[in-house]
Each structure stands twice: as structure tokens, then as C-alpha cells.
A protein has these predicted regions:
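Short, surface-exposed loop/turn segments at secondary-structure boundaries that line and modulate
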Residues: 34-72, 175, 193-214, 233-248, ...
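Stable alpha-helical structural segments in soluble proteins, enriched in small hydrophobic residues
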Residues: 75-79, 85-89, 213-225, 317-321, ...
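Extended active-site and interfacial segments that coordinate phosphate-rich ligands
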Residues: 4, 90-103, 171, 178, ...
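Beta-strand segments within the central parallel beta-sheet cores of soluble alpha/beta enzyme folds
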Residues: 36, 190-196, 223-233, 260-265, ...
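Helix-loop-helix junctions that connect adjacent transmembrane helices in secondary transporters/permeases
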Residues: 107-184, 345-422, 442
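Phosphate/diphosphate-binding loops
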Residues: 73, 80-81, 223-272, 484-493
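Flexible, low-hydrophobicity surface segments
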Residues: 1-116, 138, 211
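Glycine-rich loop/linker segments at domain edges
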Residues: 48-53, 57, 118-155, 161, ...
């Protein structure tokens, strides 16, 4: 086993004009120092299809001399031990040519890469807003957020001369297999990705990052397994984040509080090379009833690493802005914010013109109000500062709605009934700490009458039947129907 430690850029905008590796190469245990000049060719992926071939930082590592964000990998040291690789990486001298830097936290539509995209539209929101009796027109911002699970991103790559076996911290082994095969330039059947257990990811481990390609290519060049663990400080720079958003929300309403217009115009930053859109209107179109709605989105470039999915991407920052605006409207109407939400509850998804498969928002509001004693609330800002030991600790009581899609995707699974009275269930999905192993053993056990300890669950390996990503809260809902179908077929044989 060899250990790889990247050399990270100390500028955020410019180019590498020289790399002095002489001292590092002479240090004990060092096998190689790789950079643009000697790393070989890696390839970009084709546009993804479904949940296959997705990668947010599309530029292969060391692809050119450009530096577009602080912490970008510009070289990597491979050595016999992690300590030797770290010491050598620290001794590599990189010379840069700097360029103008843009990390500004205020966005304007004039900076947008393209004309804002219309994500959803119905009616004539501009006219309805212009004639509305009451209006809210505010801008809301959410900050950059990083995932930082306790388990660091890491890769162990083993190339045997023809095939790659990649042990990855990934929430999507099948997608990782496809991406790695494309970028390494080998057939997909020559790549096996394994992720048996995962110390969470929060979306940051859904798609492969450059460290995975570096480990795999280094293994190919060295002919030995290579391990690369992303350092904690690099977790803030090179493995994605939820981007800062800036959203203008316009609500128009009658004097009674019925919404006549909803408009949401969102901006988020992306990297200098990639086009990540946060999608802040994910839930806007179906949150409240209105005949007139428009949601647009646009991206602006900044010298940062590529953003990525994080815990309810789009919906979380988008609903923060929408719900804040609903509270502003309640204040101007001088009505209870729960009452405002109840009177604007939609009977169906007005964007799709379809009934909801499930929706319990009204129930949540009413039960929550009863359980929390909402009737005791006073509306004035700062009027509920607490009494006794709680004095001064609160500003008031608030309410906000939230929503997430109940989506499912295709999945495959196998179930084997073994001669020793046990069973095995397999699928190339993952357990990111949410209990997929336990859930599947319980489901199969209930169906065939076995205790869960007599059921082996095998996950996280692309040699298994293709399973769903562990993201979007849909892995369990997607894989269980496949497992139940396999159980039925196995018991009928």
C-alpha cells in the first residue's frame, strides 16, 4: 500500500508556472511526485443520463495549469507512508502567476452566466403583483455551507494491470463506477467500486471528486494500491458545498391574505468552470395556492470549488426565503402566520395539475399549534422574551413550512434462500448510517419468517445488482420494492 498526499494551491485565481519537486523526490520513502507534466491522460465525462455519469467538478485533476480556487490540487506525492507523503508534499515548491480574484458575496443579475432560467410559470404574476392590495418585496440570502461529515472523504485504489478495484467513500457506487471508467478511459466492466459502510455524507459524497481520480491514476502508474484521505481543511475546499444563495421574493395578496402572485428570483454562486444551479424553487410551485407564479434561477461565477448537493438541495434555502416572506406578509396583514398558511393551502399541485400523493401540512400546523400552545403566543416582535430563568432568551415564537419530494428511482436486488436455513439479500446501494442493512433484513425476515440475524445483507458493491443512490431520501423507498419482488420470486421457485 502506498499513500498519496496532494499539494494544494495557495492562490485562488491564476496559473501554475513552475513546480520544483527535487527536494520532495529525494526524501525517504517517496515513490513519485505527479503533476500536469507526468500524470498521464484523464478524460471528461459525457453529459449524464439519469443518475449515471454525474460529477460536479468536471475538470480532471492536473488537466491544465489554471488555478480557479484556493486548495485546488496541483500535484500529488506518493510515498511508502502517510507521514513521508505529507512531509514531501509540504516540501514541493509551486510558483504561481496570479489573476484577478472574485469571491464577493453579493450577487447581481448582471453577473449571471446566462439569462435567468424560468423554472416554473403560471398565469400573469407581474400584472397580479402590480395590482395586489398588499405586497412583500424582499431579498433573502443564505450562506455557503459545508458538509463535513465525521468520516473524511477517502479513496483506496488498486489497479492489477487491467482492472480497477476502488474502495470509495461514496453515496452512489454505480454512478462512481460509471464516472471513474469514463475519466480513466477504460470499459465500465473493468471498474469495481466498493463502499460497504459510510460515515455519512449529507450529499457531499454523492458524486466523485478529484481525489478519487488521483488515487486511481496513481495506482495505475505505480502498479500498487494507493490510499488518499482528504484532510479536514480540504473538506472545506475540494469536495463541494452548498452555495450561497440570494433570492428576491415577491408576494402579492388580498387584504384578507389570499395570495394572488408569487415570484422567486434566485442567484447562487458556482465555480469558474462548472455550472451548478441550486434550484431554490424546488418546492415553491406547490407550497401555496396561487394562480400567478414565476420562479427563475441563475448562476454567477466565483473563485471557489464546485458546489454540490447538500441536505435537501434547493428546497432548503428556497423555503427559507419563501417562508420568511410569508412571515413578513403575516405581519403586514396583522394576522396569525399559521392562519395565513392555512388559508393558502393548495388542494392539488397547481404546477403539475395533479393531486398530491401525500401532504399533511395542514395537519402539522394544527397539531403543532395545539401541542405547543400556540394560542398563548403574542405577535409583537420581542414580546415573548421569557420569564424567570428563561427571561431574555427568546424573541418570540415562529412557524415555518417545509417540504421534500417523495421520489423513487429504479433499483435491482437479489434474494437467495440458502440450504442452511439462512437468506442473503444483495443490492448495489449503500448504507450511509441510516440503517439500510437493518431495514432490508427486517423486511425480508418478515416476508419469509426468519429472524433478522439469519439474513445476510450485502450492499455497496458494483458487482451486485444495480441499486439506487443514497440521497434525496429515496434509497430505502426505491430498493424495497425490488427486494420484495425478489423475495416473491425466490419463494415461488
Amino acid at each position: 500500500m502506498l499513500y498519496a498526499v496532494p499539494v494544494c494551491a495557495t492562490i485562488a485565481s491564476g496559473a501554475v508556472v513552475g513546480i520544483d519537486t527535487a527536494r520532495a523526490e529525494a526524501m525517504p520513502g517517496v515513490k513519485a511526485v505527479y503533476h500536469r507534466a507526468n500524470f498521464g491522460k484523464l478524460f471528461r465525462t459525457v453529459p449524464p443520463s439519469g443518475f449515471s455519469g454525474i460529477v460536479d467538478e468536471k475538470r480532471p485533476p492536473f488537466d491544465d495549469d489554471k488555478v480557479t480556487y484556493y486548495g485546488q490540487y496541483v500535484a500529488v506525492v506518493v510515498a511508502l507512508t502517510f507521514e513521508q507523503a505529507t512531509a514531501a508534499a509540504n516540501s514541493v515548491k509551486v510558483t504561481y502567476r496570479t489573476a484577478p480574484l472574485n469571491v464577493g458575496t453579493h450577487f447581481s443579475e448582471a453577473e449571471a452566466v446566462e439569462t435567468p432560467k424560468v423554472d416554473s410559470h403560471r398565469g400573469d404574476p407581474d400584472a397580479a403583483f402590480a395590482s395586489a392590495a398588499l405586497k412583500v418585496d424582499e431579498v433573502y440570502a443564505t450562506p455557503t455551507e459545508t458538509h463535513n461529515p465525521i468520516e473524511l472523504h477517502a479513496s483506496v485504489a488498486d489497479f492489477d494491470g487491467q482492472n480497477f478495484t476502488l474502495y470509495e467513500t461514496t453515496q452512489a457506487v454505480c454512478n462512481a463506477q460509471d464516472v471513474m471508467a469514463q475519466m480513466l478511459g477504460v470499459p465500465v466492466e473493468n471498474v469495481r467500486v466498493i463502499s460497504r459502510f459510510l460515515g455519512s455524507g449529507f450529499g457531499g459524497k454523492l458524486w466523485p471528486w478529484t481525489h478519487a481520480m488521483i488515487a486511481a491514476q496513481a495506482s495505475r502508474l505505480q502498479g500498487r494500491p494507493v490510499k488518499l484521505v482528504v484532510t479536514r481543511d480540504s473538506m472545506f475546499q475540494s469536495v463541494g458545498h452548498r452555495p450561497r444563495t440570494q433570492q428576491r421574493i415577491r408576494l402579492g395578496a388580498t387584504v384578507q391574505g389570499k395570495l394572488v402572485a408569487v415570484m422567486q428570483d434566485s442567484l447562487n454562486h458556482t465555480s469558474m468552470l462548472d455550472d451548478y444551479a441550486e434550484g431554490c424553487s424546488e418546492a415553491t410551485g406547490y407550497s401555496y395556492s396561487t394562480a400567478n407564479l414565476r420562479a427563475t434561477s441563475a448562476i454567477v461565477r466565483r473563485n471557489v470549488g464546485a458546489p454540490t448537493s447538500m441536505r435537501g438541495p434547493g428546497a432548503v434555502p428556497g423555503l427559507f426565503a419563501l417562508e420568511s416572506a410569508m412571515d413578513e406578509l403575516a405581519v403586514r396583514l396583522q394576522i396569525d402566520p399559521i392562519e395565513l398558511r392555512l388559508m393558502n393551502e393548495p388542494e392539488k399541485d397547481e404546477g403539475l395539475n395533479l393531486p398530491f400523493s401525500s401532504r399533511h401540512f395542514v395537519e402539522c400546523l394544527k397539531v403543532g399549534a395545539e401541542k405547543f400552545g400556540w394560542s398563548k403566543r403574542t405577535a409583537g416582535v420581542g414580546s415573548m422574551t421569557g420569564v424567570g430563568e428563561q427571561a431574555g432568551l427568546t424573541l418570540g415564537w415562529g412557524v415555518a413550512g417545509c417540504s421534500w419530494i417523495a421520489e423513487r428511482t429504479e433499483a435491482q436486488a437479489s434474494v437467495e434462500l440458502l440450504s442452511n436455513g439462512t437468506a442473503r439479500v444483495s443490492s448495489a446501494t449503500q448504507d450511509i448510517g441510516t440503517g439500510t442493512y437493518t431495514v432490508l433484513s427486517k423486511i425480508v425476515g418478515e416476508k419469509i419468517g426468519l429472524r433478522s440475524e439469519r439474513i445476510e445483507v450485502v450492499l455497496g458493491d458494483t458487482k451486485l445488482p444495480a441499486g439506487p443512490i443514497s440521497g434525496g431520501s429515496w434509497a430505502t423507498a426505491s430498493v424495497i420494492p425490488a427486494v420484495l419482488d425478489a423475495v416473491e420470486k425466490a419463494t415461488q421457485m
